């Protein structure tokens, strides 16, 4: 129910209100911050600083599983915009436009469709997405799509062939698979403790509340 | 909060005074040009130009090195691999290309205030109005995220302490689940507070 006390709701105000209500702004910004904070504990360097293994991709998968398709993509976009503006929000205090010119640029850009696909698959699961569906969502979005975007860009930047780049990237695969499993466990735990963390449940509650 | 100020180095050089939009456009042009330059000699000239730009900006060697430092091992590995699969000139040019692109992007970061870049981005976001998105809400989203980083970091510290008190330091689940639930609770309270202040009216 919408109560308007002192001014009529004009037609110009309606679309923007429908598209980005206060609750979405809050969730998106806090999750963008959460992905940044997950980069703080430090990076596990396997290959020097090439493409650091961080918990940040865990945050990307969690954002997808909890916020749903477009909110999670928006959270990643907000984070990347702030990084581009020069803030050291990526793991190891990286930031600035340099990261978008470097070899791991594609992996970062891949977070966008990756989070969205994770969210999309979880949303198809309705009010009670199962563990297997969550795992599939994290693997497809958080690992599959991210690699699909990252490897060609790395090949382009380094001038190595696609096959060689893919082989180099395979060293990160075990870590990313563990992170996908961890994201599934954490998302399940969160949704059990806080049912509103399931995208479909959240949407229904908003609809019922009229907000 | 420390570390959220960006890498900006104050100064009065011509590069500092250029508008953010011009610098970003210049960066895009330069990065494309770097991809098209093939002979090592041309790239060596480009390297001299980049070094000259750094000298003009007067940001200092430490700040300059901090921009390139994160890719040092990568550059070394790339050089080695290229030396094996291609030849010396190929190795030199592809390594230089990556390092120079990163150095140029770093130069824009070093000479542009975060606030100026954000203002430029907000101007770029203005056409979002036609897609039904409110530029004011988008800029609120950006500043709210900046504000949320210290809040979530503080939450993470508290969860770590609780984890230690419970004796489950080694369980990543005992860290991440309370952190995510706490972040969501904070987000939903924040959303209600924004709505209560009339953001949705």
Question: Residue ranges of each PLM-predicted region?
Answer:
Chain A
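Hydrophobic transmembrane alpha-helices
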Residues: 2-73
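Peri-membrane helix termini and adjoining interfacial loops of integral membrane proteins
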Residues: 3-7, 84-89, 158-163
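Short helix-perturbing small/polar motifs within transmembrane alpha-helices
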Residues: 4-15, 37, 97-146
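Helix-boundary and loop/linker segments of multi-pass membrane transporters
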Residues: 17-21, 50-51, 91-92, 96-97, ...
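Residue-level signature of transmembrane alpha-helical entry/exit and packing/kink sites
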Residues: 20, 24-31, 53-60, 72, ...
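Alpha-helical transmembrane segments in multi-pass membrane proteins
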Residues: 30-38, 60, 64, 75-83, ...
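Alpha-helical membrane segments and adjacent membrane-interface helices in multi-pass membrane proteins
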Residues: 42-117
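Membrane-embedded alpha-helical hairpins and interfacial helices in multi-pass inner-membrane proteins
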Residues: 49, 125-211
């Amino acid at each position: 129910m919408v109560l308007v006390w002192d001014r009529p709701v004009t037609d110009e105000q309606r679309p923007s209100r429908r598209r980005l209500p206060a609750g979405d702004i809050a969730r998106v910004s806090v999750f963008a911050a959460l992905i940044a904070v997950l980069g703080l504990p430090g990076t596990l360097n396997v290959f020097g600083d090439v493409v650091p293994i961080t918990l940040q991709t865990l945050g990307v998968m969690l954002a997808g599983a909890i916020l749903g398709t477009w909110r999670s993509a928006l959270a990643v976009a907000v984070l990347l915009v702030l990084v581009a503006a020069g803030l050291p929000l990526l793991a190891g205090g990286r930031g600035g436009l340099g990261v978008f010119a470097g070899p791991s640029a594609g992996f970062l850009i891949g977070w966008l469709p990756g989070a969205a696909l994770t969210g999309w698959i979880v949303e198809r699961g309705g009010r009670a997405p199962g563990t297997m569906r969550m795992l599939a969502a994290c693997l497809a979005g958080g690992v599959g799509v991210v690699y699909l975007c990252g490897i060609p860009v790395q090949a382009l930047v380094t001038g190595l062939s696609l096959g060689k780049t893919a082989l180099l990237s395979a060293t990160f695969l075990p870590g990313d698979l563990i992170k996908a499993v961890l994201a599934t466990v954490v998302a399940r735990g969160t949704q059990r403790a806080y049912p509103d963390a399931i995208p479909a449940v959240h949407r229904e509650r908003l609809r019922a509340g009229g907000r | 909060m420390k570390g959220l100020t960006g890498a900006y180095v104050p100064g009065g050089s011509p590069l500092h005074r250029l508008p953010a939009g011009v610098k970003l456009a210049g960066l895009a042009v330069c990065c494309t040009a770097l991809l098209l330059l093939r002979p090592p000699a041309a790239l060596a000239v480009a390297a001299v130009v980049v070094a000259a730009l750094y000298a003009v900006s007067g940001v200092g060697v430490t700040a300059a090195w901090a921009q390139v430092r994160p890719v040092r091992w990568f550059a070394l590995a790339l050089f080695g691999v290229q030396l094996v699969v291609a030849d010396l000139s190929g190795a030199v040019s592809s390594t230089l290309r990556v390092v120079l692109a990163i150095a140029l992007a770093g130069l824009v970061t070093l000479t542009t205030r975060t606030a100026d870049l954000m203002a430029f981005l907000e101007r770029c976001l203005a056409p979002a109005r036609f897609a039904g998105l409110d530029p004011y809400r988008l800029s609120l989203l950006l500043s709210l995220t900046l504000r949320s980083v210290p809040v979530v970091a503080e939450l993470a510290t508290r969860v770590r302490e609780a984890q230690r008190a419970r004796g489950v330091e080694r369980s990543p689940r005992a860290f991440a689940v309370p952190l995510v639930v706490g972040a969501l609770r904070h987000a939903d309270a924040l959303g209600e507070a924004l709505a209560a202040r009339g953001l949705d009216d």
